[in-house]
Regions:
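Terminal amphipathic alpha-helical/low-complexity segments used for targeting or macromolecular assembly
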Residues: 1-148, 269-276
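Structural signal for interior beta-strand "rungs" in well-ordered beta-sheet cores
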Residues: 150-263
Length: 276
């Protein structure tokens, strides 16, 4: 064996030990994410256990994931796991309100059970609210592992640090991006491709509000982009599809993207104007 490989193997082993204290095992974290969803909404459980039994198992699973991340100082993993599960009844009530909002607004939805069992938007919102509680409690990295797991499954990217009010609605959802410092009010509806992003990306802005604020009762239609920490969309506003906003709009606004339509005749040859 070449001497260089020994050093290479040593570095890999060192990194492996370091990563186990910084990053929770993805497969176990992903399984816990789905089990938490099924605990709150047992629509996919073929052999459901009593809630007390599920609670005991899930609480232990969460504690085991937290121990290396928190270095288990003064029983920190136990305290955090207990605090998280104490919040779950309220989280579930909020999520039922989200599901009801989807049912009431989406003409394709036939019942609450359909929304809970099949809608990717509801699944993404559910995992956001779970991850957000862990984030609020100071959990390192695990909330991001949850959110990126859901991102991969649904195409919906919601940072767990974002603040989102009740009765939240995401329809279709693919391509939705909601940044870490975004603030979304109550009864807000978002469609596929919406971005609530930052005007610029710089490490020095880590502690600065970089993402927009969306007021109550707003509707953001497909592929609208709203950027900037100082950008505020006033309550009861409608942002039309493909709109691009970097400045605030007052309450009750309607923002539309007007496409240009040019009618050409067969007599006029189309110019070659390819841009690569």
């Amino acid at each position: 064996m070449k001497p260089g490989l020994e050093q290479f193997f040593y570095q890999l082993d060192t990194d492996r030990i370091r990563f186990t204290t910084l990053i929770p095992p993805k497969s176990e974290a992903h399984e816990l994410a789905d089990e938490l969803f099924n605990f709150l909404f047992p629509v996919h459980c073929h052999h459901p256990r009593p809630a007390r039994v599920q609670y005991a198992i899930l609480r232990d699973d969460l504690e085991q994931l937290l121990r290396p991340l928190l270095h288990d100082k003064n029983g920190a993993a136990v305290k955090l796991a207990d605090a998280f599960f104490a919040r779950l009844p309220e989280v579930r009530e909020t999520l039922l309100g989200d599901a009801e909002a989807i049912l009431q607004f989406d003409p394709a939805a036939t019942c609450l059970e359909e929304v809970i069992a099949t809608y990717p938007g509801f699944y993404a919102i559910s995992m956001y609210r779970i991850a957000h509680e862990l984030h609020r409690l100071g959990t390192p990295l695990l909330p991001r592992v949850f959110s990126e797991y859901v991102h991969g499954k649904t195409g919906i990217d919601i940072h767990p640090a974002a603040s989102i009010g009740h009765s939240f609605f995401i329809d279709h959802g693919t391509g939705v991006v909601i940044g870490a410092t975004a603030v979304i009010g109550n009864n807000v509806k978002i469609y596929q491709g919406v971005t609530l992003g930052a005007l610029q990306v710089d490490k020095s802005l880590a502690d600065v509000k970089r993402h927009p604020t969306i007021g109550d009762n707003c509707i953001l239609y497909a592929n609208s982009t709203i950027l900037g920490g100082k950008t505020v969309i006033g309550h009861d506003s409608i942002i039309g599809g493909n709109s691009w906003l970097t400045a605030s709009v007052p309450p009750n606004s309607v923002v539309l993207h007007q496409p240009q339509v040019k009618v050409r005749t067969k007599m006029v040859e189309e110019p070659w104007n390819f841009v690569i």
